Amino acid sequence: TLKEGPIVYQENEYQFRCDNPLTDTTNGPKYIALGCSRTYGIGVGESDTWSNILQSKMQNRTPKQPIKIFNMGVPGGSCETSYRILKNWIDIIRPRAVFLFTPPGWRREIIKENKIELVCEGHPLANKLKSVSSSESDDNHKDYMVKAMGHCCALYKAKLFVLDNGSTVRVDVGNDGVHPGPLSHKLFAKNFYSYWKREFKPRK
């Protein structure tokens, strides 16, 4: 990937790396991809993000039915970020399922009036937050948020598929030398695809 040159990050009006859900005309099942920079795809081209690879695999499985996955990953986002986005968009998109690649459990959001701060690596509160927390507490918080997203999905009869960032392996790096590269994204997509295929049993 490092030899392929600069990556262009094309975003819609809401700063998501996908088409605008409000103007999309896909006449088929729609899905939402949630997570942090590993979902957004920092360091890889749009075609190499796991959500794009997953969409292609799903489309090949059901070629007669158009499929759309909206990549709503937010760099530096937390599980709280994913929940907020899901809560605000699920009624609009009405997804068949939601794919969640969990962000690190220690991250948080601070919402004050119309301002949202993402407490992640590099934030002034990051080290303090880490010092007063523990891996057990972070895991519990992440579990609470995933359950909240599951409840949100259940209200709209959508399935929730979860891939935990702590249980995945990064086999390569992207252009930035830090985030997962194309091969890693293929593995993420493969995992989500197996969940989707097992649940919906699609036929060609």
Please describe what each predicted stretch is.
Residues Q10-P75, E80, N88:
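Serine-esterase "nucleophile elbow" of acetyl-processing enzymes
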Residues G41, E136-S137:
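Short, contiguous strand/loop micro-motifs
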